[in-house]
Amino acid sequence: MFKKYKKIIITLLFVLSSISSYAFRLDNIIFNQRIDGPDGGYRESYIVNDSLEKVRYKISVLPGNEKDGSKYVQVYPRVITVEPKSKGVVKIYAKAPSSIEKGEYHFKLQFKPIVIPTLAKAKDGKITGTANIQISPIIDMKGYAGEIDFKNVIKFEDIKVENNLNGKGIIVTGKLSNDSFAGIDFGAEAYGFNDFFYGAAYIGNVEKETKNKFIKLSFSQIKKPSDLKKIIFYRTPSNKREIIKEITINQ
């Protein structure tokens, strides 16, 4: 029995050490774009290589677990090489016919590692080939079909603006609702007198039919609550900025 558990522990340690030593990271890995519009939906994501070695991945589109939209999705490049301490761009495009049923459509992206052999010198001076073990993540993603006026379905209520007691700047809290049939990810911009821009904060993904989700935004550039006059919610459909909602802060 002890040998059995010892083998499991050793295996887990090996896997954990392989994952932590191979610095694979995905940024902006959310889609949430409309796929049945005239131009379809487009989003750029990033593979970040924090290691000191070159990495290469084959990217595949797989069926989603729920309403499958994988047949509408293309990804470029299909094989990507990322140099050490750099990042590579993954372009995701989805185009569905205008006749499809409205709602969310799911798909997955698989990042399968391609081993890049390297040469290493052993203690005896011999040159041998080596290869790193890499993780192969599969990411769930989704888009949607149908017209949504996010300006009317996104609500931000019970707003409070306070000093940040744990640091500089201010904290804005409130309850966020998304009354639409699709998830959305977006950010918030803070403005002061005469539309002076203080900075932005990323809100993240808000699922469909979300009710009164507690949101906390930090703006370190604002000295006191009375300096905040306006918050703008925005998103980036097909990498273009679109204002969702403008909220005046009355203090």
Describe these PLM feature segments.
Residues A23-V48, P77-V79, V153-G169:
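Beta-sheet-dominated interaction scaffolds and their linkers
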Residues M1-I9:
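Bacterial N-terminal signal peptides that target proteins for export
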Residues P38-E44, G88-V89, K102-K108, K168-V172:
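Short, solvent-exposed loop/turn segments enriched in Ser/Thr/Gly
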Residues I10-S18:
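Bacterial N-terminal signal peptides
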Residues P97-I148, P225-Q251:
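Terminal connector regions
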Residues K71-S99, F196-K224:
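Intrinsically disordered, low-complexity Pro/Gly/Ser/Thr-rich segments with frequent PxxP/GP/PP motifs
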Residues R25-N28, Y46-Y93:
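Surface-exposed binding patches on compact interaction domains or structured appendages
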Residues D50-D68, F111, D179-D195:
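Short acidic, flexible loop segments centered on an aromatic residue
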